[in-house]
């Protein structure tokens, strides 16, 4: 059987209702069609998934059409697991085209992007084995490369919030590959063919060896976002409009990023988030959950300055400053003069701070308007009420 050409939008709604009413049907939380890159040695191994479009808690009518098109193409869709992945074929595309018939003419620009995907596939003579569709029915641990990539896309496209996507086990699913431009190569393939490739001049220029691709290999940033070195941002990072990532010591890991215009000249580790208007100075490090924070994810507030080569392993509020070269961790002993403590309390009326002069860093986490410094005579870390406004150059963001 096949889907008969749908004549109207009302008929389309009827089709969707029929599909979603079938026994056991589950509405996916996310889905998309990807072109996959397979291993040069092992063609069954998927190395990368390129999604021209992902759907995240949206476009459920298109999901129903894709499920029906799979079923009519003799593919049994399994709704029982947390995800379902299948290779699509020309029969699937023909069925989807028939279902989307009322929308084909108007599927241009920003309209009906899922229909545009199907229209593009329909123009290809033979889609072969390299196009896969994935449905996520719940945010469980990913089980496939396609599912990992769909979630990374959701983060980098700002469809999902940072720290709110389950990526447990992703490292074990992705292969460590040599990246040549946007093409992944199996390392074993390069080893086995090294002699021939080097002698005949076909050995590729390897840009990196990693399990994750670069952000710019998959995502087009906002017009006012600048990334001066592609290697500085990993796929799965999330960059708000107006973010500038300078060359040198900067780096943004997956599941980390910015919430507004931010100057990034330092390192934002996995799970770390930086608020709008903040400045991560040259070589400054914001620790991730695996690098010294005891599993406590670090959020940096708005209009906060992290000085060059500083290390921050403590959540900071708005309007804070960490001086260059110092380290602020949960266990760091911090001296606060009585008069400065009163000013900090005034800026943070909900904070419960004891009247003492020595605090552990964790007692100050998330507080606003604190300037962390080091006494150059004693070496003590001190804190005082910040009196300096942190403001980015609007022309640069």
Curated annotation (Swiss-Prot):
What is this enzyme's EC?
A: 2.3.1.117
| InterPro entries assigned to the protein according to its UniProt record, in alphabetical order | Hexapep (IPR001451), THDPS_M (IPR032784), THDPS_M_sf (IPR038361), Trimer_LpxA-like_sf (IPR011004), Type2_DapD (IPR026586)
Q: Where is the active site?
A: 265 (acyl-anhydride intermediate)
- The organism is Sulfurovum sp. (strain NBC37-1)
Q: GO molecular function of the protein, one example?
A: 2,3,4,5-tetrahydropyridine-2,6-dicarboxylate N-succinyltransferase activity
The positions annotated for binding succinyl-CoA are 267, 282, 285, 308, 323-324, 331, 360, 373-376
Instruction: Name the protein family.
Output: Belongs to the type 2 tetrahydrodipicolinate N-succinyltransferase family.
The entry's protein name is 2,3,4,5-tetrahydropyridine-2,6-dicarboxylate N-succinyltransferase
Subunit structure, as described in the record: Homotrimer.
Reactions catalysed, as given in the entry? (S)-2,3,4,5-tetrahydrodipicolinate + succinyl-CoA + H2O = (S)-2-succinylamino-6-oxoheptanedioate + CoA
